[in-house]
From Swiss-Prot:
This is NADH-quinone oxidoreductase subunit K. It is found in: Cell membrane. It catalyses: a quinone + NADH + 5 H(+)(in) = a quinol + NAD(+) + 4 H(+)(out). The chain crosses the membrane at residues 4-24, 31-51, 67-87. Belongs to the complex I subunit 4L family. It is an enzyme of class 7 (translocase). It comes from Bacillus cereus (strain Q1). NDH-1 is composed of 14 different subunits. Subunits NuoA, H, J, K, L, M, N constitute the membrane sector of the complex. Its EC number is 7.1.1.-. Keywords: Cell membrane, Membrane, NAD, Quinone, Translocase, Transmembrane, Transmembrane helix, Transport.
Length: 104
């Protein structure tokens, strides 16, 4: 039975995180930015699970923390989308550059 090496998990996590970071920094659509942030959180979860499984002392702590992170990410997505809907009703746009509601 062949096992996937830790470097494969870490490489995939780095690629996912870089794609998410690039999208979060370059895109102007708020929905896309939220999706990219979720992608970055999933890359962190992949690291947690990989180190939990392939670390020096394998245990379920990383997996439990990953589940907790997913619950927090779901709450973050729900709150972010609720704020986005409220801003869209006021401004009729979802572009980051035009979100200046808090300016005096």
């Amino acid at each position: 039975m062949s096992s996937v090496p830790a470097s494969a998990y870490l490489t995939l996590a780095i690629i996912l995180f870089c794609i998410g970071l690039f999208g979060a920094l370059t895109k102007r659509n708020t929905v896309i930015v939220l999706v990219c942030i979720e992608l970055m959180l999933n890359a962190a979860n992949l690291n947690l699970v990989a180190f939990s499984k392939l670390g020096l002392f394998p245990n379920v702590t990383g997996q439990i923390f990953s589940l907790f992170t997913m619950a927090v990410a779901a709450a973050e997505a729900a709150v972010g989308l609720a704020i986005l809907i409220a801003l869209y009703r006021n401004r009729t746009t979802v572009h980051v550059d035009e979100m200046d509601t808090l300016k005096g």
